[in-house]
Amino acid sequence: MAEEKKEETMEEPRIGVYVCHCGVNIGGVVDIEAVRDYAAKLPNVVVSKDYKYYCSDPGQLEIQKDIKELGLNRVVVAACSPRLHEPTFRRCVEEAGLNQFLFEFANLREQDSWVHMDDPEGATEKAKDLVRMAVAKARLLEPLEASKVSVDDKALVIGGGVAGIQTALDLADMGFKTYMVEKRPSISGRMGQLDKTFPTLDCSMCILAPKMVDVGKHDNIELITYAEVKEVDGYIGNFKVKIEKKPRYIDEDLCTGCGSCVEVCPIEMPNYFDEGIGMTKAVYIPFPQAVPLCATIDKDYCIECMLCDEICERGAVKHDQEPEEIEIEVGTIIVATGYDAYDPTEKLEYGYGRHTNVITGLELERMINASGPTDGKVIKPSDGEKPKRVAFIHCVGSRDEQIGKPYCSRVCCMYIMKNAQLIKDKMPDTEVTLYYMDIRAFGKGFEEFYKRSQEKYGIKFIRGRPAEILENPDLTLTVRSEDTLLGKVTEYDYDMVVLGVGLVPPEGSEKLRQTIGLSKSADGFLMEAHPKLRPVDTLTDGVYLAGVAQGPKDIPDAVAQASGAAARAAIPMVKGEVEIEPIVAVTDSDVCGGCEVCIELCPFGAISIEEGHANVNVALCKGCGTCVAACPSGAMDQQHFRTEQIMAQIEAALNEQAK
């Protein structure tokens, strides 16, 4: 049990310094004993010790014992990165009755021993500098208290693909009211377009549709389709969200999905669900298993002949329907916006969009699907005949620095082999060739799937990225490539070429990212707070990531991450409140002139002007210090990193006499 905290700031600093060996990480390079003895001579240092692992229970107990017996009111631990163990040591000193913010970390591992392994003497001197600077700051530390904010027990899931569906179901099953916003007329995401899933070749819609139905019928889920998030204000526990629901021109409450309106509509248009290779009507139901099972009118094609209105017995057609603005308040947000397939038209050498029989992997998926535009038949777009020779090209839009996409999309190798196998199942006499750079069969059952492609199906693999695809007068295609295993240039003719396109962030993701205030990684996908320790969290508290929104992944990984995001989002909602760390910016209202420079620069929107001076919302502030550095009047300061504390560290670093 923690003892009652002391009134530390009015007392003379009594500092304890604890130098950690971190096994051989620090102790194998730095002379720990020399650093320990040096620290003991610094002003206000009462005790200086070393131990092999201070993060261990015995190490922490030693620190707590000294706090109680020696009356320490400041603690400095010289060890690894505060990103790893600062919470550990804060908790340690707090349990001994000391305010957790009267603790300072000196990083002797990442900032010293790991970067100076070849210079032990220099590393030891640098360790002394780092400890001296930490002690200088520790003298000026102030006790701080965390604040708490209440958390609304409702959640918002953005995106209706398999990741969004899993997240929403998990949260709803926990008892939380969950809003799901999907920009398309129906949920399903990309998984709904697939015929089979690798490596088990399960029917994609067979395993997805029951979950879609569960979403539509769940008492705790409010499904808002054909809609987009337009504004997000607030902070963890108290987000205010504005959603724009586009007009379907069909009343969802009245429509039964009977399809009568679709039958009588005289206007055809490209079917987006079939990737444009099939046609649908100007009034359409995206696919038979759609949730909600409701028609939508596309006004870009509708001629308002009113035949749909006349045939509808329930009067569900509403040609005068207007966009609807919906406002909700939620405690947490999960972003599961999925991906778009790379558009290969910029790869001019492959002729997509110019060569009739060059198609993408997703277009082939719709061909292979029994409910697709060709009723499951694989045909050449040029003449509708079955192809006798088919080539697949891997890594189109992936692992390609020339187009700014150096990352691996992680699913292309497997979905190409899956579709190659399905073609052989449908047309055993068809020759299938795969052009690849490397086969990345990393998942459970993937290597066996790869071997089956070679051994059972006799699919040919050529290692090399094709240089170009040429269209011949008879509309066959010549693929010119280097075979890197044979060390020669090859040219082979095919009836159809399928481009294995990679995954890219979906259209509109950048606008949504800015609306919510998230970061993105170099590949354009949304960035997690930490790739290993916080893979579903973001730097915006209360906002989480699921599925391909965070980066390319297959269906099992997307579902697993979705459940992880739901579990993380549930934590603050279960607790009903969250603790806000007090390392935030503060304003001296007597000095602030209300110039608003800080407002323009704050990346988290945490500052507003109230009564003529800046006011910081501590729930939004992340303590980045941007406003402090920019304030022209010096009115902004940051708790735990106050100007006088930083200056004390600088002076200690430059103090040659102390060295």
Curated annotation (Swiss-Prot):
Part of a complex that catalyzes the reversible reduction of CoM-S-S-CoB to the thiol-coenzymes H-S-CoM (coenzyme M) and H-S-CoB (coenzyme B). Its cofactor is [4Fe-4S] cluster; FAD. It catalyses: coenzyme B + coenzyme M + 2 reduced [2Fe-2S]-[ferredoxin] + 2 H(+) = coenzyme M-coenzyme B heterodisulfide + 2 H2 + 2 oxidized [2Fe-2S]-[ferredoxin]. The keyword Repressor does not apply. It is an enzyme of class 1 (oxidoreductase). GO terms for biological process: methanogenesis. The gene is hdrA. Binds 4 [4Fe-4S] clusters per subunit. This is H(2):CoB-CoM heterodisulfide,ferredoxin reductase subunit A. Transmembrane segments: none annotated. Pfam families: Fer4, Fer4_10. The heterodisulfide reductase is composed of three subunits; HdrA, HdrB and HdrC. It forms a complex with the F420-non-reducing hydrogenase (Mvh), which provides the reducing equivalents to the heterodisulfide reductase. GO terms for molecular function: 4 iron, 4 sulfur cluster binding; metal ion binding; oxidoreductase activity. It comes from Methanothermobacter thermautotrophicus (strain ATCC 29096 / DSM 1053 / JCM 10044 / NBRC 100330 / Delta H). Its EC number is 1.8.98.5. [4Fe-4S] cluster 2 binds at residues 265, 302, 305, 308. Belongs to the HdrA family. FAD binds at residues 159-182. [4Fe-4S] cluster 3 binds at residues 592, 595, 598, 631. Pathway: Cofactor metabolism; coenzyme M-coenzyme B heterodisulfide reduction; coenzyme B and coenzyme M from coenzyme M-coenzyme B heterodisulfide: step 1/1.
